[in-house]
Amino acid sequence: MKIGITCYPTYGGSGAVAAELGVQLSQRGHHVHFVSYALPFRLPTFQQNLFFHQVEMMSYPLFEHTPYTITLAAKMADVTMAEGLDLLHVHYAIPHAVSAVLAREAVGGRLKVLTTLHGTDITLVGIDPSLRSITRLAINRSDRVTAVSSYLEQRTRETFLPDRPIRVIPNFVDSSRFRPGRDEEARSRFALPGERILLHISNFRPVKRVTDVIRIFASVQREMPAKLLMVGDGVERPTAQHLTREMDIEKKVFFLSRQEDIPGLMKVADLFLLPSELESFGLAALEAMSCGVPVIATRVGGLTEVIEEGVSGLLRPVGDVEGMAREALRVLVDEGLHRHLAQAARKRVLEHFDAPRVIPQYEALYRELLEE
């Protein structure tokens, strides 16, 4: 098949999943064409059957802002006609689904459109009064719609009352890349022998509650030697950095900005923290689980579908910093519990979220679309 994929190329779950999906599909013999304003963060530069088409950002005095939705639609249509695309698979409803629907009209209606909902396109952006009606239209005009969790599927139904079914296909991870291991040399760059390393990875938006990560770590390091790695960047980073200085722990916290080698970072971590206000799935938690790194997260949204509470990870209420700190200490002190959580997490990924289990679900959906 010849498949077009559009996603945000920035540091976040939807872009990471879309990029990995494209890689996996190309390895299975499909021709995959990415269409976006920049190369997706995790997309390799050179790979057989994998292509990138950059959207040109036009500048015209009449426009106060570049009309990206329209320029993206035009590029989608151009690539469809030039490359003979069978379908467009867009990740994130706004504006990508709107652009795909416009592109379909531009090429005469023969193009199939699949929209995958990832979370904030529904729970934050889409519910804005100025975008609510167009979000609903984009969902209803897509030929198929998927959501990354049952939680998100239900939220979409309750909020937008769509006139078509929404299929749940979960996010996935390549377990051959995200696998257990320990890199003592890399650990030595951050911690002394005997020190524990806690890890957080996110886009540092307010919903990630990165200051909770700092406060959890502050409690842990008072009881045992430990370091914290904060990976990513975003609007909350300065606030988090200020808090480390305020709590006099800045020498124990490393802000590493955006990193490409996430599997390598997992190999230095003893524990992963994700105290988010809301997660429609929680890809970072899944990647940690695949690497056998125990996860402590919040009992919200799709995280309850990813993590079997008390079996493959530990969950606490949003804002329960003391509770998460206690759980962190319990896991770091009890080697048996740490080992059990690590093994159960890896097992859950292999059984439910490994790429070879999920990619065929998308392929089947593509075939279903094209056979209509």
Functional labels for PLM-detected ranges:
Residues 309-310, 314-321, 330-336:
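Conserved acidic donor-binding segment of nucleotide-sugar-dependent glycosyltransferases
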Residues 258, 277:
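Aromatic "clamp/platform" in nucleotide-sugar-dependent glycosyltransferases that forms part
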Residues 241-257:
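Nucleotide-activated donor-binding/catalytic signature segment of Leloir-type glycosyltransferases, i.e.
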Residues 151, 172:
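Carbohydrate-associated surface elements
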Residues 192-217:
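Conserved donor-binding/catalytic core segment of Leloir-type glycosyltransferases
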Residues 179-192, 361:
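A short helix/loop element that forms part of the nucleotide-sugar donor recognition site in Leloir-type
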Residues 5-11, 18, 23-70:
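N-terminal strand-loop element at the rim of the active site
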Residues 294-297, 307:
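Short hydrophobic beta-strand element within catalytic cores of glycosyltransferases
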